[in-house]
Amino acid sequence: MAPSHWRVILNGKSTDNMDLREAVGTLRKRGIQLDVRVTWEDGDAERYVGEAVADGVHTVVAAGGDGTLSEVAAALAHHEGDAASLPSLGLVPLGTANDFATAANLPIAPLEALTLIAERVAQPVDLLRIDADHGPHWCANVASGGFGTQVTVETDEGLKKMLGGLAYLITGMSRLGRIDPISARFSGPEFSWEGEFIALGLGNGRQAGGGQALCPEALIDDGLLDVTIVPDLDGEVAATLGTLVIGGKQAALERVAVRARVPWLEIVSQQPLTLNLDGEPETSRHFRIECVPARLRMHLPGECPLLGG
C-alpha cells in the first residue's frame, strides 16, 4: 500500500514555528509523504490546493489561523466533484484567535494536531457559500457583521501578535460609544426580520473575532446555517452589551438576540454592509448565504462539539 500523501499549506507568518518543523519531521519518520508549501500573497493557497488536487494528494493541511483554514477550504470547494473525490482537510492551528479550532476542540500543539489527522477518519462537513456583488465566496466558520466585524477589521496586527485574543477585547473597548446600528432585511425559509442591528453572526461554526460565540449551538454537519441578530439598543445598554459580546458573555447575548436556523438566508440593506468572512471583509448591499451540506471531509476529534453525530 502506498504511503499517505499530505500537502501542508503554511501561512507565511508562521515559517519560524520550530514545533511545526519538528512535527513534520516526526510524521515523515512515521511513513507519511508530507510536502510543505508556504503562502506569501493572495492566490497562493488557491494555487497550492489546485496543485495538490492535480497531484492526487490525499490530505491538504491548513497550517495557520481561521483565515488560512478558510482560504484552503474555499480553494477545495471551488473544484468540481463531491467531497469524496477531493483531498480531505486537516488543520494545525497557528493563528491569533484560532476560533474554529477552539470550538472544535482541536489540539493546538502541531504534533498533536498532525497526529489527530493521521488517526481520525475525515468526517463530512458543511461550508457556507456567500453570493454578493463581487461574486461567490466560501466561509468555513462564521460570517459576522456589525460591532464585532469592526473590531476584527480594526484590530492592529502588531497588537494581535503581542497580546493574542486579548487584542480584540482592547479594540472593542476603544470602540464603545461608537456603535453605529445597521438597517437591513433578513429573509429565509419560515424566517423574516427587518430592522436595525448592532451585531450579526451567521454560523457554520460557533465563534469568531477572538472568542465571540455568536452562534453557540451551531453544528458543521447539519446542513443548516445558524443566524444570530443583535438588534439596536439604547446607548448605554448597547455599549455594555458590546463589551460582554466581545468578552464572550453568552447570558447578555441570549437576552436580546434574534435567532434562527435555516438552510439559506438573504440580506438586503439600503447602505453598504460589510460581512467578515472568516477574517476577510466583503461589502455589498445584497447577500445570499447558503449552507452547502457535506461539501468537504475534515479530520476532527472524536468528541468534537461541532458534530451532531
Swiss-Prot record:
Localization recorded for this chain is: Cytoplasm
GO CC annotation, single: plasma membrane
Residues passing through the membrane, by range: none
Q: InterPro entries under this entry?
A: ATP-NAD_kinase_N (IPR017438), Diacylglycerol/lipid_kinase (IPR005218), Diacylglycerol_kinase_cat_dom (IPR001206), Lip_kinase_YegS (IPR022433), Lipid_Phosphate_FormReg (IPR050187), NAD/diacylglycerol_kinase_sf (IPR016064), YegS/DAGK_C (IPR045540)
Q: Which UniProt keywords apply?
A: ATP-binding, Cytoplasm, Kinase, Lipid biosynthesis, Lipid metabolism, Magnesium, Metal-binding, Nucleotide-binding, Phospholipid biosynthesis, Phospholipid metabolism, Transferase
Family recorded in the similarity comment: Belongs to the diacylglycerol/lipid kinase family. YegS lipid kinase subfamily.
* HAMAP family listed in its UniProt record: YegS
What is the name of the protein in this document? Answer: Probable lipid kinase YegS-like
